[in-house]
Amino acid sequence: MSVPEPPPPDGVLTGPSDSLEAGEPTPGLSDTSPDEGLIEDFPVDDRAVEHLVGGLLSHYLPDLQRSKRALQELTQNQVVLLDTLEQEISKFKECHSMLDINALFTEAKHYHAKLVTIRKEMLLLHEKTSKLKKRALKLQQKRQREELEREQQREKEFEREKQLTAKPAKRT
């Protein structure tokens, strides 16, 4: 049993020939496209074309329609997935902003504690300054009394000195 050889390229002889060398074009064969001139060579029946087109459509149309429906369903699913993804992203952003808000509240608590501490210190300082003012007032009053007493004492001593000094007697 022999295996048939593939056909030679268009217009080229592969075997020995009487008048042609190997590799030369064969007379009567064209170097142009194999489809050239087909319409002129074969008569076409419109009814046959319609049947062929109908057969092709009936064979491939159901698969194409199923593919179209599947693509539409995939597109709808993608839209749903995109919407869901956008919702999740917004939830993530809200969660992230909640973390920021929590950080702000923590910072606010910290500063509130500082303010409370400062207020307590200010109240203590106010109390101390009030006590110091009262003490200063008492000391000032005491000094004034002591000064007044010294002045009165000096006046008394001066009066006494005055009385003790010899007075010329009156001549009568």
From Swiss-Prot:
Stretches assigned to coiled coil: 63-167
The alphabetized UniProt keywords are:
Coiled coil, Cytoplasm, Membrane, Phosphoprotein
GO-annotated cellular components? axon cytoplasm; BLOC-1 complex; cell-cell contact zone; contractile ring; cytoplasm; endosome; filamentous actin; focal adhesion
Q: Name one GO biological process term.
A: respiratory system process
Composition bias type Basic and acidic residues, residue spans: 143-164
Q: Where is this region: Disordered?
A: 1-37, 141-172
Modification(s) after translation: Phosphorylated.
Q: Does the keyword Magnesium apply?
A: no
Please state the protein's primary subcellular location: cytoplasm
Give start-end of the signal peptide. Answer: none
Topology in the lipid bilayer is annotated as: Peripheral membrane protein
Q: In which tissues is it expressed?
A: Expressed in liver, kidney and spleen (at protein level). Ubiquitously expressed, with the highest expression levels observed in brain, heart, liver and kidney.
Q: Which InterPro entries match?
A: BLOC-1_pallidin (IPR017242), Snapin/Pallidin/Snn1 (IPR028119)
Name any one GO molecular function: protein homodimerization activity
Domain of life the protein comes from: Eukaryota
**Family indicated by similarity:** Belongs to the BLOC1S6 family.
Quote the function comment for this protein. Component of the BLOC-1 complex, a complex that is required for normal biogenesis of lysosome-related organelles (LRO), such as platelet dense granules and melanosomes. In concert with the AP-3 complex, the BLOC-1 complex is required to target membrane protein cargos into vesicles assembled at cell bodies for delivery into neurites and nerve terminals. The BLOC-1 complex, in association with SNARE proteins, is also proposed to be involved in neurite extension. May play a role in intracellular vesicle trafficking, particularly in the vesicle-docking and fusion process.
* Disorder noted: Defects in Pldn are the cause of the pallid (pa) phenotype that is characterized by an altered formation or function of intracellular storage granules in melanocytes, platelets, and lysosomes in kidney. Pallid mice have a prolonged bleeding time owing to the inability of immature platelet dense granules to accumulate normal amounts of ATP, ADP, and serotonin. Pa animals also suffer from pigment dilution, kidney lysosomal enzyme elevation and serum alpha1-antitrypsin activity deficiency. Finally, pallid mice exhibit defects in otolith formation that lead to balance abnormalities.
Q: Which PANTHER family match?
A: BIOGENESIS OF LYSOSOME-RELATED ORGANELLES COMPLEX 1 SUBUNIT 6
Protein name (Swiss-Prot/TrEMBL): Biogenesis of lysosome-related organelles complex 1 subunit 6
Q: What is the lineage of its organism?
A: Eukaryota, Metazoa, Chordata, Craniata, Vertebrata
Q: Which gene encodes it?
A: Bloc1s6
